[in-house]
C-alpha cells in the first residue's frame, strides 16, 4: 500500500508547498496525495507532477498519510525523493 511506501522511503518531503519546490528541482520519484485533501491545495502539485511525468499515488486519508510520515497532523501531499 502507498502508506507503506511512504513510511519505508529513505527520503520524503512533506506538504504541498515543499512538494512543488522539489518537483521544480526534478528530484522527485513519485508523489502521494490524500483524496480527502482540499482540491485547491493539491491541484498545483498534481498538475506539476503530470507535466514532469512523475507518478501520482492517491491515498484515502490525510491523517493516515501524516502518520505514515511520522507526524501528528495530516498531510495533503508527500514527495518520495530520488
Swiss-Prot record:
Keywords: RNA-binding. It comes from the Bacteria. One of its GO terms (molecular function) is RNA binding. The keyword Cell inner membrane does not apply. The keyword Iron-sulfur does not apply. Belongs to the eukaryotic ribosomal protein eL8 family. NCBIfam families: PRK13602.1. This is RNA-binding protein BPUM_0095. The lineage of its organism: Bacteria, Bacillati, Bacillota, Bacilli, Bacillales.
Amino acid at each position: 500500500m502507498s502508506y507503506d511506501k511512504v513510511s519505508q522511503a529513505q527520503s520524503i518531503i512533506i506538504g504541498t508547498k515543499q512538494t512543488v519546490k522539489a518537483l521544480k528541482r526534478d528530484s522527485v520519484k513519485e508523489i502521494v496525495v490524500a483524496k480527502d485533501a482540499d482540491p485547491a491545495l493539491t491541484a498545483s502539485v498534481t498538475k506539476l507532477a503530470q507535466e514532469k511525468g512523475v507518478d501520482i499515488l492517491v491515498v484515502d486519508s490525510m491523517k493516515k498519510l501524516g502518520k505514515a510520515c511520522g507526524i501528528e497532523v495530516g498531510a495533503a501531499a508527500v514527495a518520495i525523493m530520488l
